[in-house]
Design a protein with these regions (language model features):
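N-terminal pilin/flagellin-like segments and related low-complexity appendage regions
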Residues: 47-245
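N-terminal hydrophobic or amphipathic segments with adjacent small-residue motifs
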Residues: 8, 19-25, 63, 158
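N-terminal leader/signal peptides at the extreme start of proteins
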Residues: 1-15
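N-terminal single-pass transmembrane signal-anchor helix
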Residues: 12-41, 54
Length: 245
């Protein structure tokens, strides 16, 4: 009986301060291990969502092309493309905090809203009077958001990725099934054929790296920046999310 009472007293005394501190320490260690894992998983989920959105943009542009036998560009972009080496045009370079050069020889800089209003059949901008989409077909189904900083298509009609970066979109405006992008055509970025690009001998080197696709879509990714003086496989460019890779 004495043994039983002693055992009961031991079971009922609760945790000591030292035991509580040990438990708290273990919880802290587990939390410190869990937070980075959750952060990494969240980042990967956003990257996956961005790739899905890029695929949606490319598909919408291709469907538009199939219907109209042209790309959904504004007249200003089409005119600028003629003067660009390679004859292509990059949307999405306007209003960026990171300097992304327009194509050499191009006199026009635009964000991707010009494409979005055409693809979504919105009666504004270059699509006023539905001039560029007379069938008023909604080719793109994307999330509309209030404001101009959230992921999705904002009130300015700019399409931003899950990291809140505007998508940069290059089109094969001369219909040769090869596309030059204002950023990725640069020798400093793509030398060696990084991201599956090749040097197009039809355009004089340097800065003649191109993709064998009619549409290139990309964004800055998690770090929200890119550097035209650094290679594509190093920071800050290595986390850029691209559609053609």
């Amino acid at each position: 009986m004495k043994t039983t009472r002693a055992s009961n007293r031991h079971m009922g005394r609760g945790f000591t301060l030292i035991e509580l501190l040990v438990v708290i320490g273990i919880i802290g260690i587990l939390a410190s291990m869990l937070v980075p894992a959750l952060s990494h998983a969240k980042k990967k989920a956003k990257e996956g969502a961005a790739r899905t959105e890029q695929s949606g943009i490319s598909g919408a542009i291709q469907t538009y092309y199939n219907d109209y036998s042209r790309f959904p560009s504004s007249p200003s972009a089409a005119t600028a493309a003629v003067a660009n080496p390679g004859g292509d045009f990059t949307y999405g370079t306007a209003g960026l905090t990171t300097a992304v050069p327009v194509l050499t020889g191009g006199a026009y800089d635009a964000n991707n809203s010009e494409l979005m209003v055409i693809l979504m059949a919105v009666n504004v901008g270059p699509n006023a009077g539905h001039a560029r989409n007379p069938k008023q077909t909604p080719y793109l189904n994307a999330k509309l958001v209030s404001g101009t900083t959230e992921p999705g298509i904002g009130t300015d009609y700019v399409y931003r990725d899950p990291f809140r970066n505007p998508y940069i979109i290059s089109l094969d405006m001369n219909f040769d099934n090869v596309t030059f992008d204002a950023f990725y055509r640069q020798n400093a970025v793509s030398t060696g054929g990084l991201n599956g690009l090749f040097q197009n001998a039809a355009v004089a080197a340097p800065n003649n790296w191109a993709a064998r696709t009619p549409v290139m879509v990309w964004s800055f990714g998690f770090d929200n920046t890119a550097d035209v003086t650094r290679r594509a496989n190093v920071d800050p460019n290595v986390d850029n999310i691209v559609s053609w890779k």
